[in-house]
Amino acid sequence: MRIAVLGYVGSGKTYVSNYISERKSIPCLHLDSVKYDNEWKPIDNSVILPQVEEFMEKRSWIIEGSCRELLIDERLEKADKIVILLLPRTICLLRVLKRKKEREQEGYKSDLNWWFLKFAMFGCRNKIRRRFYAEITNKYEEKTLVLKTKKHVNDFIQSIVD
């Protein structure tokens, strides 16, 4: 099974991906982990793209992240299931704040600043991004699932792991 997980900042992409990966023994690639170093400085795409291409050759995978410049068309074509997490702003904001605290306790430099908060609450939900998700849903209707509530997310992951 190949699953592409996309969605808003703080929507639970990493949680969903890890939960399924651990229970179904499916390798998982978090695009943020290859796109940025430990201080959240971007790594050049020429270094990243071969890693993503190689990962997509696996028989089963979960790729988590909405980075369009990292082979989005190829990921969506190869995916058996596309999951788009569009949870409410308040839920996402609380998760972003919780993640900041957890990362700081793990010794990572915080990626949370005014610009990032503004992006998480408004930028990743702008008209262009909403159109992007709508286009994916229309183009890949038969294999796309849009989840907008925590209950829908939990129901989905249970349906996969059961």
Question: Where do the language-model regions lie?
Answer:
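Walker A (P-loop) ATP-phosphate-binding motif of ABC ATPase nucleotide-binding domains
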Residues: 2
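Hydrophobic anchor at the beta1->P-loop junction of P-loop NTPases
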Residues: 5
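The conserved Walker
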Residues: 9
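Walker A/P-loop
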Residues: 14
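NTP-dependent small-molecule kinase module
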Residues: 23, 124-162
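Conserved nucleotide-sensing/catalytic segment adjacent to the nucleotide-binding pocket
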Residues: 27-81
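A glycine- and Lys/Arg-enriched "phosphate-lid" helix/loop adjacent to the NTP-binding pocket
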Residues: 86-128, 132
